[in-house]
């Protein structure tokens, strides 16, 4: 899912927090506290 892919991506970058939004079939991911 979008959230799980985003979570994995931000975890790999060692970020402490993430926000994921599924909009019109596209996954948008923002990593925070990196």
Curated annotation (Swiss-Prot):
Pfam families: Myticin-prepro (PF10690)
Subcellular localization: Secreted
CC annotations in GO: extracellular region
Domain of life: Eukaryota
Disulphide linkage map: 2-27, 6-29, 10-31, 15-34
InterPro entries: Myticin_preproprotein (IPR019631)
One Gene Ontology biological process: innate immune response
Keyword annotations: Antibiotic, Antimicrobial, Antiviral defense, Antiviral protein, Disulfide bond, Immunity, Innate immunity, Secreted
Function: Has antibacterial and antiviral activity.
Name of this chain's protein: Mytilin-B
Species, as recorded: Mytilus edulis (Blue mussel)
């Amino acid at each position: 899912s979008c959230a799980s892919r985003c979570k994995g991506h931000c975890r790999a970058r060692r970020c402490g927090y993430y926000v994921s939004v599924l909009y019109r079939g596209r996954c948008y991911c923002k990593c925070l506290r990196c």
